[in-house]
């Protein structure tokens, strides 16, 4: 059964039996939601997402572009790959470094080229 996770995104077409999936498991999402690009998918069921943001510098009264890397859980039904543009949402701590889960793939790497 597909749950409503509270975000206006298209649910995945595939079904999975992962308990840490927000669509098919019992994982609740809350808090911050980010867009980013997957830079690594080597760990099992984990992706590293890089997001860019602007930071205001008071001294120079200008903005600079910064980036941060976030580890996120990658459910089997979503299966994000390197180069994909994804939407990640905050959740409870899933491991030592994972506090986010991939909710949707906004653009596949093949479509972005």
From Swiss-Prot:
Annotated Pfam families: Ribosomal_S17 (PF00366)
UniProt keyword terms in alphabetical order: Ribonucleoprotein, Ribosomal protein, RNA-binding, rRNA-binding
Signal peptide: none
PROSITE patterns: RIBOSOMAL_S17
Organism domain of life: Archaea
GO molecular function annotation: rRNA binding; structural constituent of ribosome
GO CC terms, sorted: cytosolic small ribosomal subunit
GO annotation terms (biological process): translation
InterPro entries for this protein: NA-bd_OB-fold, Ribosomal_uS17, Ribosomal_uS17_arc/euk, Ribosomal_uS17_archaeal, Ribosomal_uS17_CS
Bilayer-spanning residue ranges: none
Quaternary assembly: Part of the 30S ribosomal subunit.
Protein family membership: Belongs to the universal ribosomal protein uS17 family.
Free-text function comment from the UniProt entry: One of the primary rRNA binding proteins, it binds specifically to the 5'-end of 16S ribosomal RNA.
Name of protein: Small ribosomal subunit protein uS17
Naturally occurring in which organism (per UniProt): Pyrococcus furiosus (strain ATCC 43587 / DSM 3638 / JCM 8422 / Vc1)
Chain's gene name: rps17
